Design a protein with these regions (language model features):
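Contiguous, structured surface segment used for ligand recognition
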Residues: 19-170
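Gly/Pro-rich turn-and-neighbor structural signature
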Residues: 159, 231-234, 239-242, 269-390, ...
Length: 827
């Protein structure tokens, strides 16, 4: 069979742009080292995480070659020498001689180098060595996602190493990890079906740890809704340490204790109230530190309310200071070392940020973890002064969320470009010590995890263009160029469509049925599904499971959901005039509802032979509030009608002009900046922003040109609608501003996000609607003369403003969710 997966170029290409250059080949050539009959040597004193990685290398070698190989031999005579600085004497000698000098004093760095007729994998520390081993296996063709996304492994007769030295340097972010969260019902059911337990035991976590390490991560917050990592299986912590993964506990689980350890024993521990129950809670905290003593684990400090809630209605800074002081005293007493010798993190999540804003400060060695707003936008960044803190800053980012205005648990709704833009923002403003990603059930967030981990290694490798190329490289690591290119485009397009409105927020009222907007968006998904199916037919059987999980299922599931709600909208619209065609649309709703269940069932029981049974049982149809507290997916309401015997200069159209922000007439950029177009980012096309955000905006401007001569009506003013991304005031300036002026007239100042805050009185009236829709629409009214050609100028006064669309209304514009189809344009 002619294969289209795993071309030589594809194997050589690595998933992340941060990886070292290709060095594994499958055909002999000049200046290569053969691994035919290779053996491996390493010091028995190596940390268990290195020895585990070597064991995986041996297994991977056998998977690729089909032969038992890489037998271990003593001493330093193996074909492959693996070792860590300070542990392996031969490695230390090479460092001293200058062969591996670039490892000295480095963190988590590896060097892969041919020295004589040996291949050396050396690490500056234990994780550096592990990362070097997994870089080799990845280039051999074993994807980090071989287990979690069923990436097939192609066999080769022989393996060759191009002679030279290879590395990808040190990580830019010190702690790079995942948070398993909101794990019921999907992950919990899958674990029960797969491992036979009602909790995540060490067999499950071993799979998670291996994925993290193969992605060059080093950190995990374990699942905590109903599970207790430490208490459920004592082997969990042991395996984490053996594999070299640093553990922590989530933002509301202080002192290395899982919340379930308290929740299951409330009678023993008493009220979760430090003012009234200090003695018991201190004892609870102390046990956590005693258990993690001697590990690399990171201790969460501070305290939130019982069960991921606020501790009180107001920020009691004095109480929080007391709690943190006592926690640090316990850390010092238990470890026998100053508290600053144990890495600690304080998470400014939701209401906890109020403590910081109210003036509470923690010791300088404590890392401060900033959060996004659960919808992918950074809430705030440290000031220039704050960035100098010894403890540094971290970011807690979400691609899964349970909470208002609506859960996002079923599918990945995070745009690649949004994650890139916001993580770049975070890094540029000094958030560089910890990045942790809330991934829900882990699946189906495979690609966001890959991008997050790759960016955490070196964010500066990424630009607007290269982040789009990253998606292509991700699929090219599995398929040939033609298939990978189409798969990447389908994936990115689906992310763009998903970000318009989440599946949980989507309903019959979302889009305008009268203007044709609903038909347009449903057609968008129908065309995308057809593309996805056509591509599926071109993929060999052994590589289809990966494609079904990451591309085909999400597209089909959403295309069907759009069909269902479009049919419901048509049914309700036609039923108001007693049109009997409403009944046909009612039947369509029922068909789509049933198809949704069949698609999910196929994911659970058919993909990879039923390997992922339980992963796709999340409710997503029937939300009425933020939570999924309804029994099961609910058939949307329909009406039945009784049947008896018995429809870059723009030209105005229909009384308005709609312009994509990308289609400007001209631009002006300040010194050191440029206007950057983010593809796939807007509601309908793209978005535009002045970059970098760290530079002064100066006199930067966007100019648009339009012709109103086709309008017969008389008017003295125009209403200009400016649509921007719902960026938060991350600089804490009192809101970001831009100006709008017409034909050189007096500019009007617009502050678009001053009230975009998650607290009263703006939470329900402005914040939730804006973040759910992901855009802010502001309207200004400007005087106009009756000439034909007009020029509109928009000037940002603050950095970080992302423009999506502009509508100039001369009296004919009707409000639409996607702000109307773009007007006719000439260039």
């Amino acid at each position: 069979m002619k294969k289209v997966l795993f071309s030589l170029l594809a194997i050589m290409a690595t998933l992340g742009s941060a990886a070292s250059e290709p060095f594994v080949f499958f055909q002999a050539s000049a200046d290569v080292l053969s691994l035919q009959g290779a053996s491996v040597s390493f010091d028995s004193r190596e940390h268990s995480c290195v020895q585990r990685a070597v064991a995986n290398l041996q297994k991977d070698f056998e998977k690729v070659t089909g032969k038992t190989g890489l037998s271990r031999i003593s001493g330093e005579s193996g074909t492959i020498i693996i070792g860590t600085v300070g542990v392996n004497k031969q490695i230390d000698q090479w460092v001293k001689k200058g062969e591996l000098r670039d490892l000295k004093g480095k963190t988590e760095k590896y060097i892969i180098k041919t020295i004589g007729d040996q291949l050396v994998i050396a690490g500056s520390d234990k994780r550096g060595t592990v990362f070097g081993i997994y870089e080799l296996t990845k280039q051999m063709g074993v994807s980090p996602w071989y287990y979690w996304a069923d990436v097939p492994i192609e066999q080769h007769e022989a393996l060759y190493i191009k002679k030279g030295e290879y590395t990808d340097g040190e990580p830019s972010v010190r702690y790079r990890g995942l948070f398993l969260n909101d794990e019921a019902p999907c992950l919990t059911t899958w674990v029960k079906n797969t491992f036979g337990t009602n909790y995540g035991d060490h067999r499950f976590y071993e799979k998670v740890f291996e994925l993290i390490l193969r992605l060059k991560g080093n950190f995990l917050w374990p699942a905590m809704w109903g599970w207790a990592f430490y208490a459920d299986d004592p082997e969990n912590l042991k395996v984490a340490d053996e594999m070299g993964v640093i553990m922590g506990t989530s933002h509301h689980e202080p002192m290395a204790r899982n919340h379930q350890e308290y929740a299951r024993n409330r009678n023993k521990w008493g009220a979760w109230n430090y003012q009234t129950n200090k003695e018991n809670l201190d004892r609870f905290f102390r046990e956590g530190i005693e258990r993690m003593k001697g590990t690399d684990d990171i201790v969460t400090i501070g305290m939130r309310g019982d069960g991921d809630e606020a501790m009180s209605e107001t920020a009691d800074t004095k109480l929080m200071e007391t709690i943190i002081d006592n926690q640090r005293r316990i850390i010092k007493e238990v470890t026998g070392k100053p508290a600053e010798k144990t890495t600690q993190v304080w998470a400014l999540y939701k209401e906890v940020q109020d403590y910081y804003d109210a003036g509470l400060r923690v010791p300088d060695d404590v890392m401060i973890l900033i959060s996004d707003d659960n919808w992918g936008d950074i809430r705030r960044v440290p000031t220039a002064t704050e960035r100098s803190r010894k403890g540094g800053w971290g970011i807690y980012y979400h691609v899964d969320y349970v909470g208002a205005p609506r859960n996002t648990k079923w599918l990945n709704v995070t745009q690649t470009q949004q994650m890139f833009e916001q993580l770049s923002l975070a890094y540029d403003f000094g958030i560089q010590r910890m990045w942790i990603l809330n991934v829900g059930d882990l699946k189906p967030m495979e690609y966001p995890i890959q991008l997050f981990m790759d960016m955490a290694w070196n964010p500066k490798d990424y630009t607007v263009q290269t982040v789009t190329d990253h998606t292509l490289r991700f699929f090219r690591s599995v398929y040939d160029d033609a298939i990978a290119t189409e798969a990447a485009d389908i994936y990115n397009r689906n992310c763009q469509y998903m970000a318009r409105v989440t599946p949980e927020m989507l309903d019959a009222r979302t889009y305008n049925i009268k203007t044709g907007e609903w038909r347009q968006v449903a057609d968008d998904y129908q065309r995308l599904e057809l593309r996805a199916l056509r591509l599926y037919d071109q993929i060999p059987a052994e590589a289809r499971d990966f494609y079904r999980q990451l591309v085909l299922f999400p597209v089909q599931a959403m295309a069907n959901l759009y069909d269902m709600y479009y049919a419901q909208a048509m049914n309700l619209h036609l039923a108001t005039s007693n049109n009997p065609d409403a009944n046909l649309w009612a039947d369509k709703v029922k068909q789509c509802f049933r198809r949704d269940s069949l698609l999910c069932a196929a994911y659970n029981t058919d993909i990879a032979g039923g390997k992922w049974n339980g992963m796709m049982i999340q409710k997503h149809i029937g939300y009425r509030s933020w939570n999924d507290n309804f029994r099961a997916d609910m058939l949307p309401r329909v009406r039945t009608v009784p049947v008896s015997d018995g429809g870059y200069t723009f030209e105005a159209k229909d009384g308005y002009v709609a312009m994509e922000a990308e289609h400007y007439y001209s631009t002006t950029a300040s010194e050191g900046t440029k206007w950057t177009v983010y593809p796939y980012y807007g509601r309908t096309r793209s978005a535009v922003a002045l970059t970098p955000y760290t530079a002064a905006v100066g006199n930067a401007a966007l100019t648009y040109r339009f012709n109103l001569s086709t309008l017969n009506s008389q008017f003295s003013t125009l209403k200009v609608h400016v649509v921007t991304k719902s960026t938060l005031d991350f600089l804490d300036t009192g809101g970001f501003e831009y100006t709008v002026s017409l034909d050189g007239g007096e500019p009007q100042v617009v502050n678009f996000n001053k009230t975009l805050v998650d607290r009263q009185p703006y939470m329900y009236s402005e914040y939730y609607p804006a973040v759910a829709r992901r855009v802010v629409e502001k309207v200004v009214e400007l005087p106009v003369t009756q000439k034909e050609i007009h020029t509109l100028t928009i000037q940002p006064k603050h950095p970080g403003i992302v423009f999506e669309k502009i509508i100039v209304d001369a009296g004919g514009y009707q409000s639409q969710y996607l702000f109307g189809e773009e007007s006719p344009v000439k260039r």
